[in-house]
């Protein structure tokens, strides 16, 4: 069981790396498709697994971009893990709409709040539209894919969460 879960975590992390390489230019930086595999993992494998994939996915996306924000990416990875974890918990409770809306809003408006203090309000304001677009795209892709992939994942794996 552990080796199967580890293999699935590696698979979703690899999907996250592929998504991180697909970038759409945005106002500040770019929008990547690195989060939707984490949302898939959170819904299919459990919130702990999704959190791991979310943190790794962001770090891989930052690595591909050359870590433009330096050590701030560690904070962002932790934020991403937390947001994906909350998404997974709510999704598991069959609150899919709440999970999706909360993820989009928190990833867009709450996660970049530290940048107000580190950079300035102008940087935060410039970042928000890009994050909103990216969050919506990643969440919609995940919501479309989850029901289709649920039939492919064996029932003994579904929501057998990873302990953090």
Report the location of each language-model feature.
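Loop-helix junctions at membrane interfaces
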Residues: 1-164
């Amino acid at each position: 069981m552990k080796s199967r879960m580890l293999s699935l975590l590696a698979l979703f992390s690899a999907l996250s790396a592929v998504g991180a390489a697909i970038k759409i230019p945005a106002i500040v930086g770019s929008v990547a498709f690195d989060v939707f595999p984490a949302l898939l993992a959170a819904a299919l494998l459990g919130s702990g697994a999704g959190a791991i994939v979310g943190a790794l996915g962001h770090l891989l996306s930052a690595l591909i971009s050359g870590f433009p924000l330096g050590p701030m990416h560690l904070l962002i990875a932790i934020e991403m893990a937390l947001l994906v974890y909350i998404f997974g918990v709510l999704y598991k409770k069959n609150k899919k709409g709440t999970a999706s809306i909360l993820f989009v809003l928190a990833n867009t408006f709450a996660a970049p709040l530290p940048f107000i203090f580190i950079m300035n309000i102008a940087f935060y304001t410039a970042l928000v539209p890009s994050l909103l677009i990216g969050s919506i795209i990643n969440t919609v892709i995940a919501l479309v894919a989850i029901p289709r992939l649920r039939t492919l994942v064996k029932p003994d794996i579904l929501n057998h969460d990873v302990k953090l």
